[in-house]
């Protein structure tokens, strides 16, 4: 069990950067303490000022962002917020690359790409990488340069597979945060992140911090309202009044970033089964819904034997105003799905539990339907839950984040399996 905050013992200082210090934690093997500073910098510390309260503001922002990503399913080094100004993270050997993902062309991109106008939008987002070298102003690197560097961290050699994983992860992380800021009417313009190799698990994880130094954030998509560190970079002269303006911007972001962990959007799945003999199949749907954070209710009703009760149950859920996806589970002769689809404007999906003997025939009661009915069919309980999640994800960034993370993790697992197989056959 981790020690209480008052008992936390600090070991040696592992690293110190412009805005934070990293300490070993002897009582928590494999973890470090990330301690923020009340300091703000720009231009590789060419401009540097003390900003009272920045450590707490940055720690709040980072902790909320990492919690959001971790709950979505992104692998991060974040463990927990330890104090107002520090958090505990897995000890990683850091990969000295800053990964940048851009939706809108601005800043240094315009200087490096003459002729591109500010505001140009990238579809998909633009991925760039920069080697961390203060003496040379963090030069931009290509994928080939990173591969040929043959870096090794915590025993993991950074090759083509690892570079691809970091690039793919950077895009997914950006898109999750971009989607999360949209309900706050804020445009995430670009994002800078770093990865490390966990010294215990030997896997690449999102590490370091993501705070208001890490992105450009434009309320209402308006650059003149920028709330990020660019407001500090743009100062012609740093005065106490100007620094207070910058601090207010940082506080504005820290207050709103906590809202990213919540959603005003409601939603639920209601599984209708024709018989309790199908309960096991329905429980799988409910379990899969839980992985997306979607409430799921199970009901028993037969559209053949009690159509009046089926329609009464339908009206019950239509009447409370909560967005609902109905899943019809009936195998032998699916009346539930078609009857529900023909009598509600809510989405209905069929998920019949087909038997091995008559399944090939029974499935047609879910597939061949009269005109005016729109209930798709999936045989997978997990597929039915995912179908519902994709509907709710249109208006719920937390559900969407889990879907996007699942896509990334599936891609990574295939990439790693391919690498392992190739290594075994060489």
UniProtKB/Swiss-Prot annotation:
Top-rank taxon: Eukaryota
Any one GO cellular component localisation term in the record: cytosol
An individual GO BP term: 'de novo' IMP biosynthetic process
UniProt keywords, alphabetically: ATP-binding, Decarboxylase, Ligase, Lyase, Multifunctional enzyme, Nucleotide-binding, Purine biosynthesis
InterPro entries: PurE_classII, PurE_dom, SAICAR_synt/ADE2_N, SAICAR_synthetase, SAICAR_synthetase_CS
Reactions accelerated catalytically: 5-amino-1-(5-phospho-D-ribosyl)imidazole-4-carboxylate + L-aspartate + ATP = (2S)-2-[5-amino-1-(5-phospho-beta-D-ribosyl)imidazole-4-carboxamido]succinate + ADP + phosphate + 2 H(+); 5-amino-1-(5-phospho-D-ribosyl)imidazole-4-carboxylate + H(+) = 5-amino-1-(5-phospho-beta-D-ribosyl)imidazole + CO2
EC number: 6.3.2.6, 4.1.1.21
Region: AIR carboxylase, residue numbers: 262-426
Keyword Membrane: no
Residue segments, region SAICAR synthetase: 1-261
Biochemical pathway: Purine metabolism; IMP biosynthesis via de novo pathway; 5-amino-1-(5-phospho-D-ribosyl)imidazole-4-carboxamide from 5-amino-1-(5-phospho-D-ribosyl)imidazole-4-carboxylate: step 1/2; Purine metabolism; IMP biosynthesis via de novo pathway; 5-amino-1-(5-phospho-D-ribosyl)imidazole-4-carboxylate from 5-amino-1-(5-phospho-D-ribosyl)imidazole (carboxylase route): step 1/1
Repeat listed as a keyword: no
PANTHER family assigned to the protein according to its UniProt record, in alphabetical order: BIFUNCTIONAL PHOSPHORIBOSYLAMINOIMIDAZOLE CARBOXYLASE_PHOSPHORIBOSYLAMINOIMIDAZOLE SUCCINOCARBOXAMIDE SYNTHETASE, MULTIFUNCTIONAL PROTEIN ADE2
Assembly and binders: Homooctamer.
Protein's name according to its UniProt entry: Multifunctional protein ADE2
The organism of origin for this protein: Gallus gallus
């Amino acid at each position: 069990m981790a020690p209480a905050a008052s008992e936390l013992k600090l070991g040696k200082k592992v690293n110190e950067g412009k805005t934070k210090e990293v300490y070993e934690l002897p009582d928590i093997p494999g973890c470090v303490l990330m301690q923020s500073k009340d300091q703000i910098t720009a231009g590789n510390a060419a401009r540097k000022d003390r900003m009272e309260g920045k450590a707490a503001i940055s720690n709040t922002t980072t902790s909320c962002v990492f919690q959001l990503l971790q709950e979505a399913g992104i692998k991060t080094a974040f463990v927990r917020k330890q104090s107002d100004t520090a958090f505990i993270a897995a000890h990683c050997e850091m990969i000295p690359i800053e990964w940048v993902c851009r939706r809108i062309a601005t800043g240094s991109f315009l200087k490096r790409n003459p002729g591109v106008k500010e505001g140009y939008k990238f579809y998909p987002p633009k991925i760039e990488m920069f080697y961390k070298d203060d003496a040379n102003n963090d030069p931009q690197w290509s994928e080939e340069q990173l591969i040929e560097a043959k870096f090794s961290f915590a025993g993991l050699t950074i090759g083509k597979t690892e570079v691809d994983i970091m690039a793919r992860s950077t895009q997914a992380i950006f898109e999750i945060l971009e989607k999360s800021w949209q309900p706050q009417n804020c445009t995430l313009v670009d994002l800078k992140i770093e990865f490390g190799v966990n010294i215990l698990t030997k896997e690449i994880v999102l590490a370091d911090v993501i705070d208001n130094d890490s992105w450009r954030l434009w309320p209402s998509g308006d650059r003149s309202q920028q709330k990020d560190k660019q407001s500090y970079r743009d100062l012609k002269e740093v005065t106490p009044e100007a620094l207070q303006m910058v601090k207010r911007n940082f506080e504005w972001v820290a207050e709103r970033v906590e809202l990213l962990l919540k959603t005003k959007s409601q939603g639920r799945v209601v599984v209708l089964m024709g018989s309790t003999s199908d309960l096991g199949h329905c429980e799988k749907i409910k379990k899969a819904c839980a992985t997306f954070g979607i409430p799921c209710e199970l009901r028993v009703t037969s559209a053949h034997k009690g159509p009046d009760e089926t329609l009464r149950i339908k009206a019950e859920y239509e009447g409370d105003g909560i967005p609902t996806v109905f899943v019809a589970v009936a195998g032998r002769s699916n009346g539930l799905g078609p009857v529900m689809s023909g009598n509600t404007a809510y989405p209905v999906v069929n998920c019949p539990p087909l038997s091995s003997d008559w399944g090939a025939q029974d499935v047609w009661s879910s597939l061949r339907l009269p005109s005016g009915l729109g209930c798709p069919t999936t045989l997978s309980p997990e597929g039915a839950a995912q179908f519902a999640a994709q509907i709710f994800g249109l208006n719920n960034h937390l559900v969407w984040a889990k879907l996007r993370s699942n896509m990334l993790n599936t891609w990574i697992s295939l990439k790693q399996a391919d690498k392992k197989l190739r290594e075994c056959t060489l």
